[in-house]
């Protein structure tokens, strides 16, 4: 209803101003600004909805505020371009409509009415309400009743008798199991759900609506709210260090805790969270690649579900035979938005809906088949009688190709339990939320029936039942939950450990690289991760007087304040204010001690603008002074005009990437020498090894042959035509995810370049 009212007010404002208000520059600018704000708010809501399926929420702040890196970014380029073009067109059209009667005399009353209607349209819009609520949640002091509802359970289970298998289905919400809405979509796993304890009303709350947040909520009984931008969780050394979570209780009770997934464990800090709370055995893409049958069988995120669940079954067998009490947690990935992935072993590879194939539904149908097969193996084993199997979604599906159909239904998270010791078949319709999952499992295993804000759905009362406004209540508790981190509020001295790539201050430890915004009462860490922009782009968003400490590779800050370090890949520390003074210090010891040194200086806005502009230069446009092209740092030598077909810098150099161009092209600003030696230090990838690799300058072509290890080769060129471009053509680029950023489409690698040098020959 508010959407219709908001749009009606917007339309009325446009029509009244366009046809009645007349000419006045101030009123035109004010009305256009407010109407433009309405447009921007609603496009923001649309864009956020595209990713989260739930509008502008904490997931937007957590994972999508800085960049889309790692999110299968290529799938979002067209929608992003469409939004920008649409916004430009709407603003242009809006300005043209409002100025239609600019030659008529100004009418104060109609101008005021149009402006008030425009303000009303903004106030009534759902986007404005959602943003307002998020802002309020950032600034609240907390709720005095938090301590009454947050309860720490006993640290042990008195007499544990059951092993635990806990399966997180990526985005596998219960809505998919509605056979009337989606016929025969989940027959195998749906049948198993109906055989167990099925909790049909598991609500999603703020701070529980993405994978790591859903895991924290289900294991610790609290939403994931943090005293820093959410992706910093990948950089911290401990995760809610003072809290007692399910993994801690299991470990204290004699369980060996295992976690298996197909993606990289570092993504979003899952490794940090699990290690902080009782898990000593973790398996992700890096750990599995040496043990799986086919290490090259991967999707954009890691190993397919059939591979992961096969490894989980092997681990279940091994642990069951050992007679050691254990828990085995696993997380699938094939149903990840926006499209999902289809494992090759599935019988159900295609699902048609609305008269056409739907990739997300197909991925769901395939993944549930794999999960059901895993569960049926356990049920058929002699160890099932000692096992509790839990299946839950980590969160509701985000905006995938099935989302518009899901959104027509009453949406709930999946949570059901199959007990080998005591079979129970029942659908329980109690109101509950993800935070109740851990408490319910703990209750079944013989422990307490509460865990944080979670309560057992078998013997307790959920916060969702106690509070009708549970979403608002959860946000009111946000400051109280943030305080559970015990995060430092000041930074005076710090230590950098080069061996561990860590920085420590005030009792907290973070992985490098790291950017910190330091104020009198708050220290905010901003990491560089799969879902965040490079640190220099984040620093460019700082205000002129914001104090910062930036720890990164020297070459990344050298172009601004230390050109002598432009080719150094060592660690450096920069601190200061973008509009004031900055210093750069080279970390020259294994354990390096530093102090913050912020000075109150006069802010120079010209200096600030220059720093921001330099920070925002994209990698390929950076230039440095050197007599060769060094590939393990960003940019190129000053002599290079442009280059293409080359991937991002890595610690050793850069790969050619046929996704960016079939050839490696390096165009110089001036013609190459008449006679020169081309000294190439490089290696080949896969089938490109021991193959002739054409290297061209103008009309002359030489052949380069490389192995899988780095070697240096010198080629001799004559350049009578004054050509200015070097071209290298890898013969057989290989599509692979090796060394790739999580969630990105595979690269097509050919040769790995360490250094290329042009040496002029006499004569």
Swiss-Prot record:
Its EC number is 2.7.8.20. It holds the Pfam family DUF7024. Pathway: Glycan metabolism; osmoregulated periplasmic glucan (OPG) biosynthesis. InterPro entries: Alkaline_phosphatase_core_sf, DUF7024, OpgB, OpgB/LTA_synthase_biosynth, Sulfatase_N. It catalyses: a phosphatidylglycerol + a membrane-derived-oligosaccharide D-glucose = a 1,2-diacyl-sn-glycerol + a membrane-derived-oligosaccharide 6-(glycerophospho)-D-glucose. Gene3D superfamilies: Alkaline Phosphatase, subunit A. GO terms for molecular function: phosphatidylglycerol-membrane-oligosaccharide glycerophosphotransferase activity. The keyword Cell membrane applies. One of its GO terms (biological process) is glucan biosynthetic process. It is found in: Cell inner membrane. It is an enzyme of class 2 (transferase). The chain crosses the membrane at residues 1-21, 26-46, 77-97, 108-128. Signal peptide: none annotated. It is a multi-pass membrane protein. Keywords: Cell inner membrane, Cell membrane, Membrane, Transferase, Transmembrane, Transmembrane helix. GO terms for cellular component: plasma membrane. HAMAP family: MdoB_OpgB (MF_01070). Transfers a phosphoglycerol residue from phosphatidylglycerol to the membrane-bound nascent glucan backbones. Belongs to the OpgB family. This is Phosphoglycerol transferase I. It comes from Escherichia coli (strain 55989 / EAEC). The gene is mdoB.
């Amino acid at each position: 209803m508010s959407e219709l009212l908001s749009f009606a007010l917007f339309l009325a404002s446009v029509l009244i101003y366009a046809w009645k208000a007349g000419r006045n520059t101030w009123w035109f600018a004010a009305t256009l600004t407010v109407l433009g704000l309405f447009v921007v708010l609603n496009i923001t809501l649309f864009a956020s909805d595209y990713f989260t399926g739930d509008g502008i929420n904490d997931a937007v702040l957590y994972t999508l505020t800085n960049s889309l890196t790692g999110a299968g970014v290529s799938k979002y380029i067209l929608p992003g371009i469409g939004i920008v073009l649409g916004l430009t067109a709407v603003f242009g059209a809006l300005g043209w409509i409002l100025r239609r009667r600019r030659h008529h005399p100004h009418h104060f009353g109609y101008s005021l009415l149009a402006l008030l209607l425009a303000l009303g349209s903004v106030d009534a819009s759902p986007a404005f309400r959602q943003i307002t609520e998020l802002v309020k949640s950032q600034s609240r002091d907390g709720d005095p009743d938090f301590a009454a509802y947050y309860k720490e359970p006993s640290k042990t289970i008195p007499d544990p008798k059951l092993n635990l298998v806990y399966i997180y289905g990526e985005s596998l919400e219960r809505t998919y199991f509605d056979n009337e809405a989606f016929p025969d979509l989940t027959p195998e796993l749906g049948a198993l759900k109906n055989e167990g304890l099925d909790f049909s009303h598991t609500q999603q709350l703020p701070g529980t609506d993405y994978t790591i947040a859903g895991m924290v909520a289900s294991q610790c009984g609290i939403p994931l709210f943090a005293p820093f931008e959410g992706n910093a969780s990948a950089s911290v050394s401990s995760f809610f260090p003072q809290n007692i979570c399910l993994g801690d209780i299991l470990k204290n009770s004699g369980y060996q805790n295992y976690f298996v997934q197909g993606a990289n464990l570092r993504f979003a800090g899952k490794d940090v969270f699990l290690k902080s709370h009782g898990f000593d055995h973790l398996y992700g893409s890096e750990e599995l690649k040496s043990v799986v049958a086919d290490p090259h069988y991967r999707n954009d995120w890691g190993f397919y579900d059939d591979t992961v669940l096969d490894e989980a079954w092997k681990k279940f067998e091994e642990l069951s035979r050992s007679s050691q009490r254990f828990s085995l947690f696993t997380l699938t990935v094939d149903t990840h938005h926006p499209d999902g992935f289809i494992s090759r072993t599935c019988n159900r590879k295609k699902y048609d809906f609305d008269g056409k194939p739907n990739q997300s539904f197909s991925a769901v149908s395939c993944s549930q088949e794999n999960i059901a097969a895993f569960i049926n193996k356990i049920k058929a084993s002699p160890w099932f009688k000692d096992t509790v199997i839990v299946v839950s979604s980590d969160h509701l599906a985000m905006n995938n190709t099935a989302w518009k159909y899901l959104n027509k239904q009453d949406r709930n998270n999946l949570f059901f339990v199959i007990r080998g010791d005591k079979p129970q078949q029942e659908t329980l319709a109690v109101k509950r939320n993800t935070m109740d999952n851990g408490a319910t499992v703990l209750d079944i295993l013989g422990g307490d029936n509460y865990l944080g804000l979670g309560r057992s759905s078998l013997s307790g009362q959920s916060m969702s039942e106690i509070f009708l406004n549970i979403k608002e209540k959860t946000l009111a508790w946000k400051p109280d939950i943030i305080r559970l981190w015990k995060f430092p509020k000041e930074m005076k001295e710090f230590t950098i450990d080069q061996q561990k790539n860590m920085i420590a201050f005030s009792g907290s430890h973070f992985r490098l690289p790291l950017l910190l915004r330091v104020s009198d009462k708050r220290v905010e860490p901003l990491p560089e991760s799969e879902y965040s922009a490079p640190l220099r782009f984040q620093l460019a968003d700082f205000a002129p007087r914001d104090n910062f400490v930036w720890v990164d590779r020297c070459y990344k800050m050298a172009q601004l304040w230390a050109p002598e370090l432009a080719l150094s890949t060592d660690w450096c520390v920069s601190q200061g204010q973008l509009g004031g003074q900055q210093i750069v210090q080279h970390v020259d010891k294994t354990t390096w001690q530093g102090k913050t040194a912020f000075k109150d200086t006069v802010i120079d806005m010209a200096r600030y603008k220059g720093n921001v502009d330099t920070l925002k230069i994209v990698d390929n446009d950076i230039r440095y002074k050197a007599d060769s092209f060094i590939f393990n740092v960003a940019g190129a030598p000053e002599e290079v005009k442009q280059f293409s077909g080359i991937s991002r810098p890595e610690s050793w150099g850069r790969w050619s990437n046929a996704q960016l161009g079939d050839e490696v092209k390096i165009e110089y600003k001036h013609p190459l020498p008449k006679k020169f030696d081309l000294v190439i230090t490089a290696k080949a990838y896969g089938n490109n090894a021991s193959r002739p690799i054409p290297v061209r300058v103008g009309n002359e072509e030489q052949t380069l042959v490389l192995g899988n290890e780095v070697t240096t080769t010198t080629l001799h060129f004559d350049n009578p035509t004054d050509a200015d471009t070097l071209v290298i053509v890898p013969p057989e680029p290989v599509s692979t995810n090796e060394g790739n950023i999580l969630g990105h489409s595979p690269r097509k690698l050919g040769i790995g370049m360490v250094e290329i040098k042009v040496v002029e020959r006499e004569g």
